[in-house]
Every structure is written in structure tokens, then in C-alpha cells.
């Protein structure tokens, strides 16, 4: 369904120091990193898409988080949700919702919410039932 998701960032090195470990916890692989542009991209599935990309805005203006915009990363387990949230907060993220069940979405939805150092709202969610 999606080709890519692009998030604007203000400090490339700071963003890399945040996203590399958080996405690694989720098993998402870095596909490219070009500091001269600067931009970097990750993918979780074999093949060219979908991509998650961070970069300074191409128009050179200051990045602004969207009001009502959120990127949600899939986690295979609830432990991954917990680990990603804890790691993100240790790297400077701001908590927007602690890990937990959210049955208002569906019976097995387990998610956590936070904002990256640029204020972009992110979620890590597991949709699997506990066996």
C-alpha cells in the first residue's frame, strides 16, 4: 500500500543516533545512509518497498511535525514494543503513551507512543494475541 514514509529532521546525526537503535530493536534494516544529502532509509521486508526515510526537508526550511500525523512501526511481540519505547525515551524521546493494551482499537492491540527529538509522533504496535 505504501511506497515510503518521509520524516523531516533538523539534525541528521542526532536523528541517526535515535532511529538506528530504535529501528534495530524492531528488526528493521538500514538500506542506505548518505550524510552528504543528508538522508537515510530503512526497510523491514525484503525488496525495495516500503521505506522509512529521514532527511532534512528538500526545500531547506525547518521541519515541522504534522498535527494529527503519526508513523506507526509494527512489532512482532509486546516485548519489542516495551524495549523500543524504553530505548526511545533513553535517547531523548518524549512519552506520548506508555506501552499497554488498547482494546478500543482491537482486543490484542498493544502499543506505545512517543515523539522523536524533532517532535515527530511515533508509535510501536503489536497486533498479535498472546498464546
Give the predicted meaning of each segment.
Residues 1, 64-68, 106:
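Short glycine-enriched loop/turn motifs at secondary-structure junctions
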Residues 8-51:
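Core segments of cupin and vicinal oxygen chelate
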Residues 1-16, 71, 127-131:
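N-terminal beta-strand motif that seeds the catalytic metal site of vicinal oxygen chelate
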Residues 9-14, 72-112, 117:
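Vicinal oxygen chelate
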Residues 38-40, 104-105, 130:
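Short secondary-structure capping/turn micro-motifs that flank functional sites
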Residues 121-124:
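Short glycine-/small-residue motifs
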Residues 40, 44-83:
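Long, continuous compositionally biased terminal/linker segments
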Amino acid at each position: 500500500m505504501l511506497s515510503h514514509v518521509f520524516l523531516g529532521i533538523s539534525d541528521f546525526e542526532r536523528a541517526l543516533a535515535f532511529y538506528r537503535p530504535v529501528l534495530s530493536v524492531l528488526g528493521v534494516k538500514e538500506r542506505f545512509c548518505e550524510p552528504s544529502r543528508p538522508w537515510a532509509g530503512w526497510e523491514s521486508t525484503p525488496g525495495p518497498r516500503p521505506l522509512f526515510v529521514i532527511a532534512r526537508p528538500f526545500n531547506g526550511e525547518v521541519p515541522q511535525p504534522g498535527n494529527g500525523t503519526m508513523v506507526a512501526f509494527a512489532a512482532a511481540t509486546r516485548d519489542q514494543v516495551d524495549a523500543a519505547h524504553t530505548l526511545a525515551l533513553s535517547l531523548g524521546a518524549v512519552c506520548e503513551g506508555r506501552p499497554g493494551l488498547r482494546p478500543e482499537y482491537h482486543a490484542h492491540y498493544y502499543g506505545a507512543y512517543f515523539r522523536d527529538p524533532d517532535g515527530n509522533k511515533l508509535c510501536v504496535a503489536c497486533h498479535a494475541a498472546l498464546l
